[in-house]
Amino acid sequence: MSFKNRGDYNFTPRNVVSRNSVFFMCLASFCLGMFFTNRMWNIVPEARGISRLSKLSLSSSDCDKKNVLDYGNNTIGILDKSISNLEMKLVAARAERESLSGKFNISNEAKKRKYFMVIGINTAFSSRKRRDSVRSTWMPQGENLKKLEEEKGIIVRFVIGHSVLSHGILDKAIEAEEKTHGDFLRLEHTEGYMKLSAKTKTFFATAVSLWDAEFYIKVDDDVHVNLASLKKALSAHQNKPRVYVGCMKSGPVLARKSVKYHEPEYWKFGEVGNKYFRHATGQFYAISKDLATYILINQDLLHKYANEDVSLGSWFIGLNVEHVDEKRLCCSTSQDCELKAMMGHVCAASFDWKCSGICRSAERMADVHERCGEPQNALWTSNS
């Protein structure tokens, strides 16, 4: 190949590359480029795949760790609950031993057995006629009282402490009555109207120490009770751990000293004219075993207000307790309980609100029993 310069001289270089060589060099470069490019594209997805697998592996590892932690936390929670229950039982057992310490003669069989309910009938030294009216109506006597315990799991006792002069004439009268009927629970408590809160606390602590039951009940000796209907009403709450059953009310806090239910600590409930927190009326209420055990363990710490029903309500107000407003426990004796009995909806407990019990109960209990009582064999023929 020749070139012509400005001076018109022909010039032919020796090292000039031919067109064919250039073409083959370009083709070779292109092929090499394609080869390396394809190889790099193969490497990148592999790297991305490895990265994705690593992330999945890490994610799976994190999930496994979370599951292990959740399982561990749940297990710890269950163990904590079990330990708390065991601690409560241990404290209750210690309190039981200290509370009883050989004061009561209860058979080992009675201690081991599970009862449905323990009914404590609050009574006083002067209430012999009331007790006799209860014995002649709704409270079984003699062998039937034992049969009630053995077949139906129901304990019924009149509850009373001792007089100021221990072993005095009043105490001896109760001892003689006990020999005849065998239906008393004597408490380590000095009797007195202004000491009802202390008596209630001592009753529940003593009862839960003596008998293992689903429910513990306090009822006044001027209230009529239908035992089969009562058992039916409480059976609906049998599997609840902390339940407080009664006719719930919220009356005014009485600040004046001249009134019957005066509350000396009225200032704790706020301004004058305020009402009490919701609590069961004092004529009749029932609590589950856990709550009775709570009273047993903490009896030295629980504050006592002037009125025992308010005191009981105050002990539960800050706890995780289910309050059950059960109107079958507070029927009126005028026409209410009779009409309900005729309709087949027998009341569990009946009294007169105006008298805070059955008015002249020693005289009228038999009449109320005839009008408002359940069928004679209702308790014995029931399946429960």
From Swiss-Prot:
Pathway annotation from the record: Protein modification; protein glycosylation
Lyase keyword on record: no
Cellular component annotations (GO), alphabetically ordered: Golgi membrane
Entry EC number(s): 2.4.1.-
GO aspect biological process, one term: protein glycosylation
Protein's cellular compartments: Golgi apparatus membrane
Cofactor(s) needed by this chain: Mn(2+)
Keyword match Transmembrane: yes
Known glycosylation sites: N73, N105
Broad class of enzyme this protein falls into: transferase
Membrane topology value: Single-pass type II membrane protein
Entry keyword set: Glycoprotein, Glycosyltransferase, Golgi apparatus, Manganese, Membrane, Signal-anchor, Transferase, Transmembrane, Transmembrane helix
Family: Belongs to the glycosyltransferase 31 family.
Protein name: Probable beta-1,3-galactosyltransferase 1
Source species of the chain: Arabidopsis thaliana (Mouse-ear cress)
